[in-house]
């Protein structure tokens, strides 16, 4: 999830958005203004480095999901920069494994009733090889979300 100078900031400031969570923010990118923003709007956030030290993302996801009302609208944004070695605007060797992201997305999509929004941001291929990787990655995420969310609604 992104957190500065974007539509989420506007939505929080305008009281359109009730809750906001950023899970796995890299500590090196947590500047004082972002921290102040999170505190001002009572945002939930966690650091990626805490997960390296044993914190459970699955537990954090469950906590956040349990804090939502049953039919509360939920939007999901996955910043492709957060995936290790993903061709993206801020590509990094450190980050989530792609299959971890798929697992967590599938978990969220299958466990909540009202998710009209999936935004996959910052993928930025620069050559033909990157095009294939990014294309397949985005396709997997869309298929995972669609099948899990739709299957849950049919059951």
Kindly give the residue locations of the regions a language model identified.
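Conserved alpha-helical scaffold segments that buttress catalytic/binding sites
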Residues: 1-155
């Amino acid at each position: 999830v992104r957190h500065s100078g974007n539509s989420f900031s506007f939505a929080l400031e305008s009281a359109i958005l009730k809750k906001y969570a950023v899970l796995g923010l890299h500590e090196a990118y947590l500047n004082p203004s972002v921290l102040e923003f999170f505190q001002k709007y009572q945002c939930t956030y966690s650091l990626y480095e805490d997960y390296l030290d044993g914190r459970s993302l699955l537990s954090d996801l469950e906590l956040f999901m349990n804090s939502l009302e049953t039919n509360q609208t939920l939007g999901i944004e996955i910043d492709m920069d957060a995936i290790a070695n993903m061709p993206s605007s801020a590509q990094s060797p450190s980050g989530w494994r792609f299959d971890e992201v798929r697992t967590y997305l599938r978990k969220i999509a299958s466990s909540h009733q009202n998710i009209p929004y999936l935004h996959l941001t910052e993928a930025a291929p620069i050559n033909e090889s990157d095009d294939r990787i990014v294309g397949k990655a985005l396709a997997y995420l869309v298929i995972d979300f669609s099948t899990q969310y739709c299957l849950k609604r049919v059951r």
